[in-house]
Amino acid sequence: LPQTIFRIINGRLFDKSYPYRMIDADTALALARATELSEFVVKPARDSSGGSGVAFMDLAGLASFLPAHMRRHSDWVIQHPIRQHECMSALHASCVNTIRIITIRLSAEVSVVSAFVRIGTGTTRVDNLTAGKSIAVGVEQDGRLGRYGYDNDLRRCSAHPDHGYAFDSFVIPSFSAAQQTCIDLHQSIPDLDFISWDVAIDQQGKPVVVEFNVGRQDINTSQVCSGPVLNPYIDEVLARDRWLIIPGIGPIDRHTDIAPD
């Protein structure tokens, strides 16, 4: 995970240790100052999607940010920025281009269902598609990008619109290691069977899990980029997952089509 400096939890400040130790604002700013960083990543700790709320600020900005958000009893994490691998910067240098890797647990095994990379465009610093300024490109098993990328409006392109870099000429560094990292982490979370991981590749070529998604995840973008990604697993998924949750109705038994009392 990215290196954390301190956290805001329910409006109170805590250092990065675990168990968390409560600190005051002066101590939090001293921790930030001690990093000698010129910029910090500030992002919501929960109920965030699509890069919403993520900000980049200097120490002065951080000092102004703290009082307001402590009063609101909100939850934030303040982290070191990720410095991505030079190859990933070749795709788009203004933001960290992350790989979405989806894993599924069936029986005792965890497998990678699909992967795509989100590439920024223009001056955007957030690579999420819902921000409307990114392109998603499918990733093959060997780390090579697919031929086409798609923006949030499903417009197709074969090269980056800013600099003309052909997608299918690019291979993601350390892609195998990134997949294995997600598999290993998923193995340690036994109560979740479907997880979407956002992974960066740092300057040393090591995978860095930026975050993982267990709530508002879907496979729409994966299927646009790579086709019906659950096809190899569909029989096992349907056989195992007996209950279908229908909004407004509740759980339906796939075997009987009768909702329980």
Predicted regions and their residues:
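Protein kinase-like catalytic core scaffold
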Residues: 40, 111-113, 208-210
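Short, solvent-exposed loop/turn segments at secondary-structure junctions
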Residues: 46-49, 83-84, 108, 118-120, ...
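Phosphate-binding site of ATP-dependent enzymes
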Residues: 59-62, 66-149
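C-terminal active-site "lid" helix and adjoining low-complexity regulatory extension at the edge
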Residues: 155-180, 187-192, 201-261
